[in-house]
Amino acid sequence: MNDLIKHKLELLPSNPGCYLHKDKFGNIIYVGKAKNLKNRVRSYFRGSHDTKTELLVSEIADFEFIVTESNIEALLLEINLIQENMPKFNIRLKDGKSYPFIKITKELYPRLLITRQVKKDGGLYFGPYPDAGAANEIKKLLDRIFPFKKCKNPANKVCFYYHIGQCKAHTICHTTEAYWQGLVEDVKNFLNGHDDKIVNQLKAKMKDMSDQMEFERAAEYRDLIEAVSTLRTKQRVIRQDMQDRDIFGYYVDKGWMCVQVFFVRQGKLIQRDVNMFPYYNDAEEDFLTYMGQFYLDSRHLKPKEIFIPGDIDQESVEALVGDEVKVFKPQRGEKKQLVNLATKNARVSLTQKFDLLEKDIAKTQGAIENLGKLMGIPTPVRIESFDNSNIMGTSPVSAMVVFENGKPNKKEYRKYKIKTVEGPDDYASMREVIRRRYSRVKRDGLTPPDLIIIDGGQGQVNVAKDVLRNELNLSIPVAGLQKNDKHQTNELLFGDPLRVIDLPRQSEEFFLLHRIQDEVHRFAITFHRQVRSKNSFSSKLDGVEGLGPKRKQKLLKNFKSMTAIQQASVEDIQALGIPEKVAQALLDKLSQDSH
C-alpha cells in the first residue's frame, strides 16, 4: 500500500457510494459498491484475502469514489460504471457471472424471462438489475399485471394462470398479433418509467371491482398499485425518463473551485468529470467560464438537458450552450437532489485535496528536517542540484534545479553551456559550472543554498568542494547522489571524508532525493537535446558564402527544421532579407548533401 492510498483511506466518508480501484497507469481495474465507503474500501488493505482478491489488491495504486444518497443508488451506479469501464477484475471476481436482465421473447405468444445472457435473437432485454432478487421482484409484478404466456402447455390447452386472469396465450382467448404488440409496448413503457398508464388502468379496475362489491379483487388491484409505487422508488437509477443530461455541481474553498459533472445517458449515470483549479474572480463567473470551455472540448458532446446549481445565471448558461440544449435550475424534488449530489461530491473532492495537501506538506517538511539531522547540518530549506550532459564531449551543458521546502522552484532553474572544456571531461565541466554559479552568488549578494547536491560520485563532489572552499572561500555543504548500474538513485555521499549516509529506500528522505535527482537529470538532458539540435542545424548551413550567424538564426527561427528549409523556395528564403544569390546557393548545397 503506497502513501497516497494511506492518506486517502483516512479521508473516506461513511456514506454509501461506489469506489473505483486504479492501477499504476490510471486504468480502472475494479468497481465496487458500499453501504459505508470508509469501512468497505479500508477492508481491502487489512487482513488476509483469497487468492483472487490478493491479486486485485496487489495492482491497486490509487482509488476514487462517488458518494450516493442511498445504497440502492450505489447498486445501480455500480452496474453503469462496470458497463462503461469494463474493469478486468469485475469479470474475474464475479466468476464470469453477468448481471440479470428481464427478457420478452419474440414468439407467437411472448414470455417474460430472467436471463444473464443478452443474445441477438429478436427478444427485448431490460436491465441490467443489481442482482437476481431485484429482477425477480420486478418480474413477479409484471406477471401479475401483464397476461404473457407463463406455462409450457400447448396453445389449445388452458393453464392455471388462465383461470386467474394472468395468461392469455391460448387459442380460446382469440388474441391478435396487434394485441401482443400493444402489450409489449406497455411493458417497455412501464420498465422505462412511464407507468402512469398502467397505474390508471389498475385504478379503474379497482373502482370497477369495488362498484361490483368484489372487495377482495379490489384489494388485489390496490396492492398492485402500491407495488408499482414501491418499485418506482426502489429502482430509480437517476431518472426513469431515459433522457440524456449533464448535471453540474461545484464547491469553492480557500481560493479553489471543484466542478463535478455527472453524465447521465439513457437515464443512467455512466461517468463523471472532476476538475479542480484556482479561481480568481467571482465564483459564479468563473464557473460560467469553465462551462463555456467545457463544451468547446470535442470530447464533451452537448446533451439534451443540463442541470445547474441555483446560484448560477440560467440565461448566461443558455447563451453558452445554444438553443438546442434545455437548461434547468431545479428548485425542488428529484432533479434538485441530483444537483445537490453533484455539489456534495465536489465538496468531498475539494476537501480531500486540501487534506492530502496538508499531509503532503507536513510529510515533505519532516523529510527535509530529518535529512538535515542525518547529515548533521541545519535543515536544508533551499537545495541546489547540478547535473552535466554531453555525448562524447559534444555540445556539453550543465543544469541547475532548485528545491525550496521540498518543492521545485522552476523560476530559479539555470542552464549553462560549457565554455572552457574541450572533450568529455565531467570533472572540469563541474568545476566550471560551480565556479560560475557561486561566483555570481557571492558577487551579487544572492542567498546561498543550504545544501548543494551533485548528480555524481566522489570525483564530482570533491571538485565542487574544492572550488567553493579554495577559490571562492564559501562554506556550503556539498553532497553527491550516486546511481547504480541501472541508472537509479542508489546512495547519498556526504562528509569529510565522504561516506555513505544510511537512508532506508522506503523513507521520505530517500524519495525526496530521488525526485531531485530525476528532475535535474531531466532538465539537463532536455537542454542538451536543444543545444545539440541547434548545433546540428547550424553545421548544415556552414560553407554557404554570405550566410553568417544572424542569417542562420533567422532561418532557424522561421523554418524550425532542415526539412522545412529544403522544401522552401528561393522566394521564401528571400522574404527573410536573404539575397537571392545566397538563397539559391543554400538550396543547392542542401540538395547536394541529401544525395
UniProtKB/Swiss-Prot annotation:
CDD domains recorded: GIY-YIG_UvrC_Cho
SUPFAM superfamilies: C-terminal UvrC-binding domain of UvrB, GIY-YIG endonuclease, RuvA domain 2-like
PROSITE patterns cross-referenced by the UniProt entry: GIY_YIG (PS50164), UVR (PS50151), UVRC (PS50165)
Domain called GIY-YIG: residue spans: 14-91
Compartment(s) where it occurs, according to its Swiss-Prot or TrEMBL record: Cytoplasm
A GO cellular-component term linked to this record: excinuclease repair complex
Domain UVR, residue spans: 196-231
Entry's family note: Belongs to the UvrC family.
Function: The UvrABC repair system catalyzes the recognition and processing of DNA lesions. UvrC both incises the 5' and 3' sides of the lesion. The N-terminal half is responsible for the 3' incision and the C-terminal half is responsible for the 5' incision.
Quaternary assembly: Interacts with UvrB in an incision complex.
Protein name: UvrABC system protein C
Native source species: Streptococcus thermophilus (strain CNRZ 1066)
Gene from which this protein is expressed: uvrC
